[in-house]
């Protein structure tokens, strides 16, 4: 990828060293990746949008890739991660008071918090896969998930430090990444102990046309070095984030938004999600929600599966805000 003019550097922000990939000049687009992912998730968008006259910036979030991974699980709250990104923008683009944000998966969760905490910093948001989720003051998140899905649900299995990491280590880094990146079951993801992803760990995984062995190997090289703990720590802070954000109960997102999701995405198919997105709930909490796009036959990693369409969707939206 370096040969295509993507520049890499390390920036000191918020007490950590953050690795950033960037290319291009013009209005800044900040790309925020999810789990288990890297700046690399946005490789197609970086090339396309920089060619259209934007400065594309894609960091590895704390805990990922070539960015520092603090040891304490409680160093991965929404306040830490939003703090990293605001500090990054202050450092690399002090002249750009507002930027575009494109986010996916956990990156979208972080982007929604960014909208709540610092709406003054965003021109517009394109959120992929994960819609805004209003805070329920009555019930903590993990208890809610356990009540709906049971203890084998992947987010519940992620809670106990070290447990899922040991199971992932047994299966092997490359295998885990292939399982996640190629996951197309629209139903919830269960990871029962000792059962992995529900198929024998020596069963071959055929990669889709949009994901090559070389691309998987790039991921594997980075995750071999870091392990999965940094990324999983985000899930371990769901309840702490809930506690820390009491003051934002009922708050609206006052940023222009475009939301894009695949109809095979497990998040889109979770209980209540479609009704919330399409029947007024989403628009109530994000009154500047301008477009909802549902991509047929597309699963969770849509920016990699359908890069050309996603690039067009991003550009068609953000060009209205110059």
Predicted regions: what is each one?
Residues 19-69, 104:
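Conserved HGGG/HGGXW glycine-rich cap/lid loop of the alpha/beta-hydrolase fold
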Residues 287-322:
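Catalytic active-site module of serine/aspartate enzymes centered on a nucleophile-bearing elbow/loop
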Residues 35, 39-42, 106, 112, ...:
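Signature tryptophan residues that serve as conserved aromatic anchors
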Residues 2-7, 17-18, 28, 64-102, ...:
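Flexible "cap/lid" subdomain of the alpha/beta-hydrolase fold that forms the substrate-access gate
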